[in-house]
């Protein structure tokens, strides 16, 4: 999707995954772990709603009693903001969690970070997200990558809180996941200090927005989202 801070986008799109391939990832993980998989997060390399038909087939398969019988409440689907597909997803009777990759609180900054915003604005995106909540009753997750000097100041936190309150008056309607950016040589972005990340979270909480700093895994060995794929492509 061309997001400026993301390692996943550097290599470009190769092709869409088929439902059987998505299911294969789950069965392989279950085999390797020796235990049942009871939760799915569709996030990371690729845009699930840009592969809508295959994504939905996979979701119906894993939630079906004749499939893996994983409850919709244990499944999250992330999108960078393909607005028309959000309205389609709410009609699928899946009751899954919708995760919005937001990463900025105004259109100017978000369009610079995420090209998809030039087609569908923040207002269009959050209006669709609110509609999804109203239709399904499922809390919306807001993903916000913290980038030092770009979107991580106390003023940015206040702007984000004010934005979200305009669309989600109920405190239980959404939750913000804060994600310190993973360093990617090609992007030049860096993450702030642990103190600045915690201060951002506190500013959101003080404004009535529930927020959690997501635990990061793999950056010490370049194994975070998209990094291994990028390293493999360079090898």
Feature-to-residue mapping (PLM):
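Radical SAM enzyme core and accessory elements
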Residues: 216-235
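Short, surface-exposed helix/turn micro-motifs that flank interaction/cofactor sites
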Residues: 4-7, 177, 226
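Short, surface-exposed helix-loop/turn micro-motifs enriched in polar/charged residues
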Residues: 13-14, 37, 69, 213
